[in-house]
Amino acid sequence: MKITVHSSKAVKPEYGACGLAPGCTADVVPLTVLDKANFDTYISVIYAFHAPAPPNAVLEAGLGRALVDYREWAGRLGVDASGGRAILLNDAGARFVEATADVALDSVMPLKPTSEVLSLHPSGDDGPEELMLIQVTRFACGSLVVGFTTQHIVSDGRSTGNFFVAWSQATRGAAIDPVPVHDRASFFHPREPLHVEYEHRGVEFKPCEKAHDVVCGADGDEDEVVVNKVHFSREFISKLKAHASAGAPRPCSTLQCVVAHLWRSMTMARGLDGGETTSVAIAVDGRARMSPQVPDGYTGNVILWARPTTTAGELVTRPVKHAVELISREVARINDGYFKSFIDFANSGAVEKERLVATADAADMVLSPNIEVDSWLRIPFYDMDFGGGRPFFFMPSYLPVEGLLILLPSFLGDGSVDAYVPLFSRDMNTFKNCCYSLD
């Protein structure tokens, strides 16, 4: 598969096409404490659409219209008047790259999570000032692949997914839904007086001197991180949920069961000592958990992490039901009170006084003995329709971070789940042998 780039340009908000006056380019949106707690890195995803797909000029025009409603993605990171990190709404534009492939898309489907897919989207390193970079690649058969690269500190997966859908709505002339909510200053105020009722040191924050303790694998083929895509059918998930919910007052959720199962399988594959502590960090969306609720169209980050913890021996020798109970208890703990405690702590002055930094560190390339879970099961990726139909395939880009688990709904649309599992190559065969076992 040879990808040839033909053009690259900045697309700016097209106010005239929407009958609106240009926005004020002096507008500054300070990052919230929840934005600052998230990963300061670029994330890439890939969509595939069958032919016919709208011409690139139509997609570009739709992008310009969508950016009128989502000016963040046409802006740049900078600082506000007080020196804090902020989004500058300067309408500098999002990057739009046009490319072609020399093969039919069917000949390379399903795309595999290898370095080859990196050619299907721009790199964040290509335009470090731009917050969103898009590549549209036409294949010889007329099919279209759209690759997005976005700065995670601007928004979480749910709000970024809302923008992807908004772009498709603007392209086909439909109203943007949900309506974006931009006023970050109206949310996440600290309480008076502050009430920090949970420990946030060592959870969302860590000492600055530990920020650069990056763990990397050693050289050699056995220490190469490989990403394996695992498909869990609807039938397998039903059996797993029945297995994990035996004797419970109500069935366990798909997310909790799949995470519990993979946590155990990855721990077995790693061959951890029985007394070693292992945890799983699960991203928890606070929109519906906070009171008052944060609107669905909110455009920033509303994520904190549940961190169930146990020993490797306890995890693998006890049934999956035990892991589900650990996960359920910790996820339930990340409630309105926890979010507000975090906000109060982040505004207490302790972060600055103690020189704390976010534990969400994109420089960590090896997470063992722990894992981290990004669940995209409820993000509306498959609602994106430029006018030629919804995508028939979606995937995260190649991201070889050992232990970073990404879950998403299968493109089959039948309730099955795809999991992208990065492990050292030396551990992968053991993982493959146990990941479909319910023992």
From Swiss-Prot:
EC supergroup of this enzyme: transferase
What keywords appear on the UniProt entry?
Acyltransferase, Transferase
Q: Which GO terms describe its molecular function?
A: agmatine N4-coumaroyltransferase activity
Q: Where is the active site?
A: H152 (proton acceptor), D385 (proton acceptor)
Recorded family membership: Belongs to the plant acyltransferase family.
**PANTHER family, per this entry?**
AGMATINE HYDROXYCINNAMOYLTRANSFERASE 1, TRICHOTHECENE 3-O-ACETYLTRANSFERASE
Assembly and interaction partners? Monomer.
- What protein name does the entry list? Agmatine coumaroyltransferase-1
Which organism is the protein's source?
Answer: Hordeum vulgare
